[in-house]
Amino acid sequence: MDALEQARAEIDEVDAQLAALFERRMAAVLQVAEYKRAHGLPIFDAAREAAVLEKAAARIHAPALRPYYKDHVQNMMDVAKQYEALILGQNRAAYQGVEGAFAHIALRALFPHAEAVSCPTWDEVFAAVERGDAAHGVVPFENSHAGDVSAVLDLCYNHPDLWVVDVYDLPISQNLLVLPGTQLAEIRSVYSHQQAIAQSETFLKQFHLPATAMANTAMAAKFVADSGDKTKAAIASAETAALYGLEVLVPRINTDGDNTTRFIVISREKPTAGNRFSLLFTVDNKPGKLAEVIQVIGASGFNMASIKSRPMPHVPFEYYFYVELVGDPTADETAALLRELDRTCRTVRLLGVYTK
């Protein structure tokens, strides 16, 4: 046996030992899940995870190996959380649309082992999470080309019991999908989500193609596939084309080559750890009140990564505001900022905590 074979044999032997230890560890995870269910405890415990990682690093004598072992332990904890979610019936994530929609693609990246729950509207995604039918919801929040998804921000405002717990940036490549054998000259109408249509506006104008908005890109692709009509085309992902038996006639028709959609993850569980946090607030309709809030944030030392305004529901010509701040949401400075904003604003609410 040469040196390579001997080393591989050693790895195989260790892997066999790890398999037995993995089963033993997951049996303990099962006990943890049952305890959490009995006592109403959340799956994620940030303080516990941090302590486990520090203890794990201390066990490794070779400094060069410590970061790799911490990654290994973090992966084991992530697997454990997925298993706990399955045991506790929380292994469901909701999205708007059908299989192949960009939200579905984002969901699969975020929750590869979750049961994906399809909803007809964004409102239904929020409702499913609020009812407990899904532990998480994945919805688009903004696009680097087409801008904000205002309706989703309004839903965040209207659902004060839900939190934003994660964000995910999905690079978007819009493609013109057709029935097999279709030529560009045959197309008379194009179907897609309004955002995808806006992202592909230059291409559509160039070829004088009228577009009709649908609930999402995957539904548009399914509609074209089911129609059997070569005069119809859809704008969607290449993954969606494969899913519904369509061909990519023209790839990457979106105007912005760096097109990215940011998705947010909503949950009933309040997040605790991250390097960014977002707030929703309102101010009295008086001169200088918004400027005063911005000055308070600036004086606190937090960088304001984003600020948006939206009309308040049922209150004509008044607005609520969204801000995203860079910083530790658990720091004393954050608590001080929230106290000062509570004094300055008419209303203020912590919306989300996440890592970006």
Annotated model-derived regions:
Residues 1-356:
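Domain-level signature for soluble enzymes in the chorismate/prephenate branch of the shikimate pathway
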